[in-house]
Amino acid sequence: MVSTATKIATFAFNNCLMNAAGVYCMTKEELLAIEASEAGSFVTKTGTLAPRQGNPEPRYADTALGSINSMGLPNHGYQYYLDIVTEMQKDQASKHHFLSVVGMSAEETETILKAIQASDYQGLVELNLSCPNVPGKPQLAYDFEATDQLLKKIFSYYTKPLGIKLPPYFDIVHFDQAAAIFNQYPLAFANCVNSIGNGLVIDDEQVVIKPKNGFGGIGGDYIKPTALANVHAFYQRLNSSIQIIGTGGVKTGRDAFEHILCGAAMVQIGTALHQEGPAIFKRITKELQDIMAEKGYQTLDDFRGQLQYKP
């Protein structure tokens, strides 16, 4: 029997597919729909210290090859999502979950994480170091010194399982520099990648979204090659205890297969989930299982990270 089960840290999941933060996870109702689907888990909307309305609309648009968005982290506040996942973990039949959070400053991030540390929540936290769509707030993970300082502070008190959501990197030197920092800390996972920041999509003679004069994060088909490169680069460089989550351009079982082949232990779906809804998890799981069966693979470990190079 072909299995798409996987593990992150000590947490077992019956399927490697899940949503990406920001997509189909704003409300409790949306999260419950993911929970009831074929997905192995869900990640919440990135929760900030206080609720946020986000950027003015229109702030999302589908395109022929994916999507562009400048949402600006709209959310109900981290406490809303913390309450949901803490309550759900009381049910032994519940899946394990990921709580996505970030502050608008390093101080706010620490306030949030200290509250989670003191809470009853025992699941995974995904620290979002990579949102490209908050005006005036740079993507922290591109500042290696600031990232190192923040992680050093966090792990001086935070003892629960925590991973990081990364922006795409484009230079081999940056893969090396980032990995050297991440390997110093007991991270549970690294999620590669968030949307490619500050793309521009034009319809006739006008931009298609309002914030930032049309600049926004690019997702979908556009970013799969970049996502695969980041997944494989960090799979090669990070400690084996730091699992990789692959995100970007996944709309078929073949796409998920390629992420796993590059080293991903789990695969998140964003743009295609937004377009198709939670039923997508059943379809992509079946497509992935069919590929595995055709190739004679019984588990993800049979091919995870086994990308072949030209001789």
From Swiss-Prot:
Chain positions recorded as substrate binding sites: 45, 69-73, 128, 194-195
Function: Catalyzes the conversion of dihydroorotate to orotate with fumarate as the electron acceptor.
Cofactor note: Binds 1 FMN per subunit.
Listed HAMAP family: DHO_dh_type1
PANTHER family tied to this protein: DIHYDROOROTATE DEHYDROGENASE (FUMARATE) (PTHR48109:SF1), DIHYDROOROTATE DEHYDROGENASE (QUINONE), MITOCHONDRIAL-RELATED (PTHR48109)
PROSITE patterns the UniProt entry points to: DHODEHASE_2 (PS00912)
GO biological-process terms attached to the record: 'de novo' pyrimidine nucleobase biosynthetic process; 'de novo' UMP biosynthetic process
Major localization class: cytoplasm
Subunit structure: Homodimer.
InterPro entries xref list: Aldolase_TIM, DHO_dehydrogenase, DHOD_1A, Dihydroorotate_DH_1, Dihydroorotate_DH_1_2, Dihydroorotate_DH_cat, Dihydroorotate_DH_CS
Active site location: 131 (nucleophile)
SUPFAM superfamilies tied to this protein: FMN-linked oxidoreductases
UniProt enzyme class: oxidoreductase
Family the entry assigns: Belongs to the dihydroorotate dehydrogenase family. Type 1 subfamily.
Pathway(s): Pyrimidine metabolism; UMP biosynthesis via de novo pathway
Domain of life of the native organism: Bacteria
Underlying gene: pyrD
Cellular compartments annotated: Cytoplasm
Residues that bind FMN: 45-46, 128, 165, 193, 220, 248-249, 270-271
Cellular component GO terms held in the UniProt record: cytoplasm
E.C. numbers: 1.3.98.1
An example Gene Ontology molecular-function term: dihydroorotate dehydrogenase (fumarate) activity
Catalytic activity: (S)-dihydroorotate + fumarate = orotate + succinate
Name used for this protein in its record: Putative dihydroorotate dehydrogenase A (fumarate)
Keyword vocabulary terms for this entry: Cytoplasm, Flavoprotein, FMN, Oxidoreductase, Pyrimidine biosynthesis
